[in-house]
Amino acid sequence: MAKSRLSYIDLAVEDALRGYVLSGRAALLLSGTVYDVLWANADGARLLGASALRPLLDGEATPNAAIMRQIGAAASQLDQRDEAAAMVRARLGFKPQLVALGLTKQTLNNGDTAVLVVSDEMHGRRYEEDDMAQAAVEGLDGFGHASAIIGESGEIIAASDKFATLDMSTDSLNGLLDEVAQEDDRLIKRMLTTPVGDIAIGLARLADAPARHL
């Protein structure tokens, strides 16, 4: 499977995607050919039968072939229209269920074309923000040393087990939040000195009111 030229956090700040990091809907970003999965949220990975994002995006896990065929058939309609729809049968709990999907063409910030696939709310579930945040960081296991969803004032909404090892002070964290708030592309990347060594970090501003960050 071909990799995107953009990293997960680079794609997370795309206008079409940033609202789906914390969402009750499954979201997938597929290549223009619909053969490659470029990005997904936690429920998007589950929709394709993957337990985590890293294996799916690195090509180590094979996405559900039947669902990919159905998405591909629906995506062929995008040559004549702006939107398309598909109904797929996915195993999201104890038994398979029908999930409605909407497909739209997207042009990414780097000029690449892609197809965004978004489900209706997953089998009627209503997530609390804490649940969505925890699902997001758990899905990112293996992408880096640590991850977290951070609120407007630097509060940690959810974090991976290793995030505490970064030992970031409130002042340091709020300084980074102030920096990213000034960036038009909603993203900063820095080297951070931590007790476990110098680590490259990325901070993405996902939402503004209230502010939410990855």
Region roles according to the model:
Residues 1-19, 118-136:
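Short, charged amphipathic alpha-helical "coupling" segments at sensory-output junctions
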Residues 19-21, 140-141:
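PAS/LOV-family sensory domains
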Residues 23-28, 144-147:
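A short helix-to-beta-strand capping loop
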Residues 25, 30-135, 162-214:
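Sensory/regulatory domains in signal-transduction proteins
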Residues 34-35, 147, 154:
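PAS/PAS-like sensory domain loop/N-cap motif
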Residues 150-151, 166:
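Extended, non-transmembrane interaction/recognition domains
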Residues 151-153, 161:
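Amphipathic, soluble alpha/beta structural segments
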Residues 157:
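Structured alpha/beta or helical-core interaction and ligand-binding surfaces enriched in interleaved
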